[in-house]
Amino acid sequence: DTGEATTRDLFMRMRESIELIVGHLDTSVHSIPPSQKSRPIGLQSRRHFFFAFKEALNNVQKHANAAKVRVVFELTPSHVTFEVSDDGVGFEPEEVKGSGHGLKNFRRRANRVNGQLKIDSIVNKGTTIRFSAPLNHRNL
């Protein structure tokens, strides 16, 4: 692995993960902009972005009791972003603190690539996780 890949490769792997993990749910996938140009992405950004995405999908599968999942991929000249939203049971962030590694892992991954993480959840309404990482971050 040379440490270089493209966002096109990354998004293809992510689409495969959607099918494997939450493909049995009513799933919609959107790209912003709709026809994205492929851009190079550094190894660390790619790794942490992909594993955070899989964690978000696994959380929907394990905890959300959701019927619908919406995934958005967003690409700008400097950042790659995913947003995973579900219509599941949601949670109170205060009640989740210390009860597992999922939220800590999201924060750690965002910090490692100088990225941003936003988690919104409403009990009985669902959860949205938004994770953004710079395309060129390298943790040497």
Give, region by region, the residue ranges found by the protein language model.
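Coiled-coil dimerization/phosphotransfer module
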Residues: 1-140
